[in-house]
Amino acid sequence: MSEPARPPGWLPKAEFDSIFSRVPRLCVEVVIVAADRGVLLTLRGIPPNVGTWHIPGGTVLFAEPVVEAVKRVARYELGLNVDVGELLGYIEYPSHYNNGLDSPVGLAFRTEPIGGLPSAEQLPDGCAWFSRLPAGLYEEQREFLAHRLGLPPDPA
């Protein structure tokens, strides 16, 4: 059986790790907010920080337009087609490079699901709406969401 086709710009893990251990990695963050529900977060399924809540995001592929990367990540992480809106800002991740990992920089975009906001029942496993920022959320993302969107932390 042959391997599935890889997207343009795909790198084997060893090459990816080698490159991004030396240079910053451009990422996109998919921010979906609803006044009556809060922000949509997902549980990380890959290292680092497996099992923690985070803003859905991913690496921009070689020669991929940033807006297309946002749409691709939304489809992959959330199963949603989105319209890409305002650039909310960027998130640097010192927790990564301070721990000997890579050095990602995430461009955070407000997005709107095409066809309306999904209900909790329509979301894939590991996704949830939060009106307060949960414990265990990436610290850099917690600071960003609190500052940019005014979301309070969960008191628990």
Q: Model-predicted segments: where are they?
A:
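Conserved Nudix-box catalytic region and its N-terminal flanking loop in Nudix hydrolases
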Residues: 38-77
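Active-site-adjacent beta-strand/loop module that shapes the phosphate/pyrophosphate-binding cleft
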Residues: 91-117
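NUDIX/MutT-family hydrolases
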Residues: 108-110, 119-151
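A short coil-to-beta-strand element that immediately follows conserved catalytic motifs
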Residues: 81-90
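Acidic, metal-coordinating catalytic segment for phosphate/diphosphate chemistry
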Residues: 1-29
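Hydrophobic (often cysteine-bearing) scaffold residues that line and stabilize catalytic clefts
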Residues: 24, 66, 141
